[in-house]
Amino acid sequence: MHIATFPALAITALALVLWATVATHSSNTNSCHMSYMKPDMIAMTGFNTTQTPLAHKYSLHLYRELDVDLSREVGGRPVLFVPGNGGSMRQIRSIAGEAAVQYWHDPRRAGADADTWANGSTARPKSALQKLNTFAFGDTESDTEGVRGLGDAVTARDMSGDDRRDAVERPLSNGKLPSQWPDDLPLDFFTVNFQEDLTAFDGTTVIDQAEYLNQAIAYILSLYSSHPNPPTSVIVIGHSMGGIVARTMVTLDSYIHGSINTILTLATPHVLPPVSFDKGIVGLYHNVNEFWKTETVPGGKLEDTLLVSVTGGIRDQMIPAEYSSVDTFLPPTNGFAVATTSIPDVWMSIDHQAMVWCHQLRRVVAETLLVVAGETTEKVSTRLDTFQEYFLSGMERVEKKAQNASESSKLTLDTLVSINTPLTTTSNIIINDHSPNQLVKTKSYFKFPVLKASEINEMSRSFAMPVDKGKSLLVKTNMPLEDLHILVCRTNTGDVDTNGFSFLRYGSKSKGVRVGTDTLVCANVAGEAVAMPSSIKYATGAKIPEEEETGEDNDIPVDSAISSTSLSEYIQLDASSLSGFQYVVVIDNTMSETISSDSYLLAEMALPSDMAVVAAPTWWEVLKVGRFTIELPEKRALLTKISLPHFWSSLVAFSIRLSTSDSFSMEYQCEAKKSMGSEHDVLFAPLLMQYSAQLHEAKFSTNLCGGYEQGTRVAVHGGAPYMPLAEGRDVSGTELYLWTDSSSRSSESLSLTLEIDLWGSLGRFLGFYRVMFAIFPMFVFLCLLMIQLRVWTTTELFVSLSDALDVFVDFQLPWILAGSCAIPFVPHVLVSLLYPQMSQPGQFFLGLNGTHLWFLGPVSLVIATGIVVVLHWLLQILTLWVCQCYYMLGLAPIAPESPFSVRRIVTISFLLLLVFKIVPHQFAFMVAVLVMAMGAGKARVGRLMQSEDKDNKSEPCVVIDRNLINYTHSLLLLLVLLLPINAPTLVVWLHNMANKWHTPLESHHEVSAILPILLLVLTASRGIMIRLPQSKRAIYATFAFLAYFALFVLFHGVVHSYRLHLLTNGLCLCLLYLSL
């Protein structure tokens, strides 16, 4: 393969990666609803340079929701918002506006006087109708910004009636009423204008912001000093890199101990920095994580500090979800990480920017903050329980053992009565309509004294089911639990005062009558219910009846149907939890006129073996055909748990399809009737949940109908590249939970097919390895440079990069690709010899924690080679253009001369002085790149002039130094490959200059960091080539350094990319020695 054909392969690989990114991004539809608010930012002018010199650059503001919260004084509980990289202080307006609406539209204060709330607010009381009007249509005298969404500007009158009603009158989620808030105070949201600082690229900027915020918190708390029961801490919300700033605050000397005890982060990369181009940001991450790891233990400085990390999941194309995990530095007693797909009433993936404005998420966040704000003085366990209640799906506790007849769960006996009604018992309890004559499959008939609370009306229906030893109880319903009593009961053994309560129990008809006198003790297990989305009984793309009335297009894709469906509840109690109980009792108190015909309750007892399916295909078995199928047993339970122990890599995405084994498609089964062997319609469509313990991620996929034509995507969040593992934890596989209507299944079995999603996997590959595409080309270039130097030492001919690429592709690349396949198998101890500071395995090369994706190494190197080819072509065009400009200006070609003239010494001394005092060394690096580009272009002038002499048939008057042309071109490519590492810091400096902030960036003003590069550029641009030294030791030393440089780039360059600049300085010193 020669240079003429290889670029086609390389460029094709690049195009596929870019295509995969676009395809992956477009396939995940944003289902967030727009948020609306009326913001008013009040500048806190009292916090100025007398408190901190950073006030020259930053400013503190108080948020108020116009026409909802009219007070301009603080009087609630303080919350501080920290924007992320390039973020705005206005990003808090969605959450803050929602919190204000939820608090001030609380029915308890609808008619309250203004002076009844904290510290004498001047807000005038409004009626509910006035509040609705002012919120929806604005106040023309006071509103300067109108109602805005965090996207396009939206006027107040553009809000639909449903939006206004939802904004004001919707009930709070999780069933928690406003009267249950522990502290009847609003929230005071403070936000900071950081001038859109770029914190992802510079560690110094992060520390500056953290210092400013510590002083700001001291000032905020001082505002409450005259209030009764003043707060002593602030809740901090950080978006993106704002979460790292919040965590950095507690590590600084300026931090007031206890002033922060709750931190909520949204899409924050906690484990690894987004890019590792800056030494400061890499070191800061290491120091902050170590501090949190050592200080969150009992007795540590942060033992009472709570950290909750929320990630948007697969839709976040900027920050991989795995980077938001906290288990590597935080014990479970002090926080957790959760994906938005798990949060009840959200249940969807959210992109990076939408995390602060997505209506479904901000509603839950605001409600949670209102509750937690009153618990800031409580123990960390109390606040942790609150966040877990609102943010976790509940599947984490399905295996939790129920408390046997605990006092808190018993029904009070004096409120119970005994009724003696005919009751059908079976292994299943099925309720899916409200006709009194509904029958279920019968095994035996009992006259059973069903317990019934006094408020239950006489129209209630009662069902009972015996508890089978060794079986688990499974209950799924979409009926409101406040209208159902789901009880587990046992015969009283004398540990409960029965007050003479008794009942009669009859045996089955075939065994005659047996009379006994006993008492029952029951526990209500509704508290064990897990909320989840309903799975509608309509085929994919069908219309939902209740939404057809809106006239909107309600075609429902598989992955987006969650936002359009109602809730369902699931209860699971294992055999140990049911130990000692004899009966499961369901009392249905629902009214037929208030419940739709699609309402159902399904309860059954099932053996663990009926619920568990373990599929353990190897990666080779999957890769051979790209898919594998799991046959589900015919006698399956309501829930089927499918374990995939080998599927843990975050780099592989799957699509899942559900089908039947016979001619009936799954689409037909969802609409199936009794003709399929059922005695009633299908209660619900199959519901799938993917669960990841690391991120507490429960990703639901509803309405799995449509057979092979439709599928749902599954992205695993387990073993991510370069991710350190928490102590005592290993990578685990994937778990899938499938709920199907077991009561209506026919004889055919179901099969679940997992197929590798090629485009989704390529998109994940690019998301994790975007830094790799900027680093690995340096490895390819160093290999090319070694080829050029090897030829030069034997022939004194410095070949072109095109010739070196031919040699590299034909002879070296196949061996390198073969060797890269074996790198995942190299022991960690051997790799650490290149960089002893590497602490954990899986942080070298591609950061793989296993060997099954060994082929990614060759793929990455092929793409890196293609990038070098493209850059080589582009620089050829650039230098030819520069050469043409020199020729048109009549400038002479480059001629070797001493680089140390007085003028040049003065110029370079002045530039170094600027680096030492004012500009970062990255600025001098950019100057070096420009000088090298001009030098490489000027080196070609002689070739252009010789070509003209040939056209004029005259003797050539210019001697062409082809060695110099190739040498300067190679040096230019070397500097261009370093641009991604140096450009971000330069952008930060220019941003600071634009905001008139002239504080030097620490660690970026080292003269030694740029001097070797400047000297080499100065010599090469003046026509001075490298020469063969008399001693071969210098050549051997240069080759040894190049080999080390190349291996470091390959093994550690992605995680420690900032070190490439230092190694390039070493290479420049070697070439400079050969030049002089």
Swiss-Prot record:
Catalytic machinery residues: 240
Positions annotated with a glycan in the UniProt record: 48, 119, 404, 849, 952, 966
Taxonomic source organism: Yarrowia lipolytica (strain CLIB 122 / E 150)
Protein name listed in UniProt: GPI inositol-deacylase A
Keyword tags: Endoplasmic reticulum, Glycoprotein, Hydrolase, Membrane, Protein transport, Transmembrane, Transmembrane helix, Transport
Family note: Belongs to the GPI inositol-deacylase family.
Location within or outside the cell: Endoplasmic reticulum membrane
Function: Involved in inositol deacylation of GPI-anchored proteins which plays important roles in the quality control and ER-associated degradation of GPI-anchored proteins.
InterPro entries hit by this protein: AB_hydrolase_fold, PGAP1-ab_dom-like, PGAP1/BST1, PGAP1_TMD
GO cellular component, one term: endoplasmic reticulum
Gene Ontology biological process terms from the UniProt entry: GPI anchor biosynthetic process; protein transport
GO MF term list: phosphatidylinositol deacylase activity
Enzyme Commission number: 3.1.-.-
Name of the gene: BST1A
Membrane topology (UniProt): Multi-pass membrane protein
Superkingdom classification of source: Eukaryota
Residues spanning the membrane: 3-23, 765-785, 815-835, 855-875, 877-897, 910-930, 970-990, 1006-1026, 1035-1055
